[in-house]
Amino acid sequence: MTKLSIIVPVYNVEKYIRPCIESIFKQGLDDADFEVIIVNDGTPDRSMEMIADIIQQHSNITVINQENQGVSIARNNGIQNARGNYILFIDSDDLLIDNTLPYLLDKAISSKADIIVADFAEKDDNGITTFLQQSFHQKNGNIEEVKGTYLLSQPLFHGFSCVWRHLYKKDFLIRNNLSFTPHIYFEDTAFTYQCYAKADQCLIVNWIFIIYRVGHQSIMNSNFTKKKAIDNCVIINKIWELSEDKGIESNIRLKIRDDAFSFFSLLIYLVVSCDGIKRSEKMEVLQYLKHLVPDLSFKNGLKQKTVSFLYRRMPSVFLTLRIFYANYLQRNIWAIKGKMKNINNTTN
């Protein structure tokens, strides 16, 4: 019986893909217990050539070739072809820490949890690895069983929505029709929120098992574009839709709405402060956000009404004023969460 399917999308990672695949086979797992699904997303470089010998050596590796359609469709194809009880998504430039996966897999199988949440380390471009605990608050030691909505109730933190820090029960994903939104950036965020909202049983495990390579993929760098801004709008909308799901406890829905406001504030800061987006494109993003996301306006008090009016009726003026405000937000970006929570309490 295949216990675990490890899905690895591959695109333009010839520098990193071999160490990634090698790390999977340094886990001390029997080949019969897991499979590796490598999804070649039409990569134009030598990525597949770099791992050709590893593929030949292991009968539990399956290669799926597709035209370049993005990581979301690559992962979705992996899900549909997976035979394991549990699924792990790995980015092709990341690494598993030697002999750490069996412990997590054992906890998953024995608990039958929908989702296992674990910790990770980070490796920068200089090769320096930082081991840090970035996880949810645990009341009872190193392992805790909770509902998915408990995870949604927790404060946002670095790595909150990264799919590669989770094991997912395949039956849970299929039964709830959970998949990645195609052709957008930041697909992890919406997927994680939707999974947490549906999960009856999650296991938080204080266990570092994967090394995330940081530096070249950050949205805070110069590669932030109009396309990424629009995709952020889509993600915010999906999160907002969850806040209107009456099947979720009211206090959790307020927290989800609070998160949407936080992402909204961060997006506005990124748009107005990014040199790579033309002013005309910034205006397009503001207009798109205004019509896509439900009521994000401020309703109470003269100051709030003024901000709402400028944003909705005079976006050009709003954008100009917002640029002056950007430096303040850079120092205090998450402080706005408290203000938004007060607005939520007033309007609900």
What are these regions (language model features)?
Residues 2-5, 35, 190:
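Cell-envelope/extracellular polymer assembly enzymes that use nucleotide-activated donors
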Residues 13-27, 50:
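Short, well-formed alpha-helical segments that are part of the catalytic scaffolds
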Residues 23, 40-50, 67:
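A conserved acidic beta->alpha catalytic loop
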Residues 32-42, 62-67, 92:
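Short beta-strand/loop segment that forms part of the nucleotide-sugar
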Residues 66-82, 92, 103:
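Glycine-rich, basic loop-to-helix element that forms the pyrophosphate-binding segment
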Residues 71, 92-205, 212-226:
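Donor-binding/catalytic cores of nucleotide-activated saccharide
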Residues 87:
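Short aromatic/hydrophobic "clamp" motif used to bind/position activated sugar donors
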Residues 273-348:
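Membrane-interface aromatic/basic loop that binds lipid-linked glycans or pyrophosphate carriers
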